[in-house]
UniProtKB/Swiss-Prot annotation:
General function of this protein: Component of the COP9 signalosome complex (CSN), a complex involved in various cellular and developmental processes. The CSN complex is an essential regulator of the ubiquitin (Ubl) conjugation pathway by mediating the deneddylation of the cullin subunits of SCF-type E3 ligase complexes, leading to decrease the Ubl ligase activity of SCF-type complexes such as SCF, CSA or DDB2. Also involved in the deneddylation of non-cullin subunits such as STON2.
Major location (coarse): cytoplasm
Sequence positions bearing N6-acetyllysine: K25
SMART domains named among the record's database cross-references: PINT
Annotated positions of the N-acetylalanine modification: A2
Gene behind this protein: Cops4
Keyword Acetylation: yes
Signal peptide extent: none
Name of the protein: COP9 signalosome complex subunit 4
UniProt record, GO biological process: protein deneddylation
Any single GO CC term annotated in Swiss-Prot or TrEMBL for this entry: COP9 signalosome
Keywords for this protein: Acetylation, Cytoplasm, Cytoplasmic vesicle, Nucleus, Signalosome, Synapse
Gene3D superfamilies linked: Winged helix-like DNA-binding domain superfamily/Winged helix DNA-binding domain
Amino acid sequence: MAAAVRQDLAQLMNSSGSHKDLAGKYRQILEKAIQLSGTEQLEALKAFVEAMVNENVSLVISRQLLTDFCTHLPNLPDSTAKEVYHFTLEKVQPRVISFEEQVASIRQRLASIYEKEEDWRNAAQVLVGIPLETGQKQYNVDYKLETYLKIARLYLEDDDPVQAEAYINRASLLQNESTNEQLQIHYKVCYARVLDYRRKFIEAAQRYNELSYKTIVHESERLEALKHALHCTILASAGQQRSRMLATLFKDERCQQLAAYGILEKMYLDRIIRGNQLQEFAAMLMPHQKATTADGSSILDRAVIEHNLLSASKLYNNITFEELGALLEIPAAKAEKIASQMITEGRMNGFIDQIDGIVHFETREALPTWDKQIQSLCFQVNNLLEKISQTAPEWTAQAMEAQMAQ
């Protein structure tokens, strides 16, 4: 039957008639090819593609018929459709400028098949082949933005944050031009994930936290974004930016619903965190967040050591490297190195006396510390009052009336 389709196509290519009549006859042949099955169907469809890209066929007809052809293929088995898509892209390549719209459609559909198969890299690379900026066709902003975001997301799924960042940067140039709110949200999610994968944790936390307030996002997804914001903040390097983010999250009552709230509370209140308190939190982290740093420690270990060092700087005026190492549960030399790095980067105030083996912490102002402690106490008292009100609303109402009457 494939041979019959090929013969019909050869006869039609040598015949004359109006575009409308010829297009109708080609559609009949396409329908006949679609009705076949197995190898016969595959060969017939390939023959149809070869006919469409032949220069003897009018470009008006071939573009129209290739568009129709693309609408039929999703109904075929994925294995057949994939082979036909690849064959079509190969045959169209010499005349790709003439069939840009059809090629873009084929690449989108082929990428969907690869995505379904969880072949993320091939899906991304197929979409990269769409000439969004260099082609003859003018693509609208939303189409380009959506495609770049899809490529970035696919590279993230393939654990390639470098390529993902390259395409999210291209999307960044377009997102201000788009009025599609859904695409704007997708951009923010993807950008936050790229920052997260690239270990730019404080920037990722800020983006995730921003998403957690977007009313267009479903409530469960907002809470998920808040959870990611909290995890990224805990993993971020100690310093002023992280302290500000910890304060923002600690004041957000929604964080009390999250499993990692206990760690957040300890970090915000500058308490020393012990290694055995981290096991439950470590199990919640995503694979890329469990990576090790250059010195062999995990990202979480490094973040907690820096936090504990900053907490120690608020407890002591000075401390020897040996004592500091014991406090941080790490070798003295490593404690010295981390303290030196934090002081050099301006993330901790102090200086190191290497002759005596002591790190000196510069005295902090008492007033801001008192303010922070009072603020924390008020916050906790407010939480207690809310819980009492929920448990015993009638008693709370009577107590309030009695207070007002005094």
